[in-house]
């Protein structure tokens, strides 16, 4: 029974923290409208940027990252050894929030947060990959997907083998949620950062 509770509670904490839709909350509070009716309809920072409010997009990015970071750190403190469960649940919460009928974001910023919390070297590789690909291509989705795929590889190479399975699973989730972006990349029609499409 105790084992079941110690598995369930980290999942609940991770999911609840991860499911807070900061992008939607911030755009509504600042009068920017319903983010789900803007641009791609996604609740993440890239779509917030399409409102023309760069500061709001940066705040969304940091808060989405921060909730993933917080979920893992809190669970590590209370239930040592269960941080991978919290990481999984936090990203799932962001992508499938119950409050928004399970229609959330694509998990890139939150995955960066959990990567940093699991082991900062993994998070550093994630950030450098994301920003590097974004800088070179100016395509947000390509940067995010590249970083997600690199994360489990970095975990394996840097000696964090216990985190490889959860990071690999989350990378697959991120790729799945970007399937429309992948189709547009192949067609050469994926919008670049700054586009309002």
Swiss-Prot record:
Disulfide bonds: none annotated. The keyword Cell inner membrane applies. It comes from the Bacteria. One of its GO terms (cellular component) is plasma membrane. GO terms for biological process: phospholipid biosynthetic process. The chain crosses the membrane at residues 7-27, 55-75, 78-98, 116-136, 157-177. It is a multi-pass membrane protein. Its EC number is 2.3.1.275. Keywords: Cell inner membrane, Cell membrane, Lipid biosynthesis, Lipid metabolism, Membrane, Phospholipid biosynthesis, Phospholipid metabolism, Transferase, Transmembrane, Transmembrane helix. GO terms for molecular function: acyl-phosphate glycerol-3-phosphate acyltransferase activity. Pfam families: G3P_acyltransf (PF02660). The keyword Cell inner membrane applies. It catalyses: an acyl phosphate + sn-glycerol 3-phosphate = a 1-acyl-sn-glycero-3-phosphate + phosphate. Probably interacts with PlsX. This is Glycerol-3-phosphate acyltransferase. The lineage of its organism: Bacteria, Pseudomonadati, Pseudomonadota, Alphaproteobacteria, Sphingomonadales.
């Amino acid at each position: 029974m105790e084992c079941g509770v110690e598995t369930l509670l980290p999942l609940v904490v991770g999911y609840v923290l991860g499911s807070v839709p900061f992008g939607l909350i911030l755009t509504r509070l600042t009068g920017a409208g319903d983010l789900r009716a803007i641009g791609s309809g996604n609740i993440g920072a890239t779509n917030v940027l399409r409102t023309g409010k760069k500061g709001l997009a940066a705040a969304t990015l940091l808060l989405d990252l921060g909730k993933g970071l917080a979920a893992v750190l809190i669970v590590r403190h209370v239930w040592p050894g269960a941080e991978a469960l919290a990481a999984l649940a936090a990203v799932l919460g962001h992508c499938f929030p119950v409050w928004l009928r399970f229609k959330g974001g694509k998990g890139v910023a939150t995955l960066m947060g959990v990567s940093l919390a699991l082991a900062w070297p993994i998070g550093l590789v994630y950030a450098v990959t994301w920003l590097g690909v974004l800088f070179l291509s100016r395509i947000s989705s390509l940067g995010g997907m590249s970083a997600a795929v690199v994360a489990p590889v970095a975990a394996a190479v840097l000696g964090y083998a216990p985190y490889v399975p959860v990071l690999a699973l989350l990378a697959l989730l991120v790729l799945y949620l970007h399937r429309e972006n992948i189709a547009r990349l192949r067609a050469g029609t994926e919008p670049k950062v700054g586009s309002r499409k």
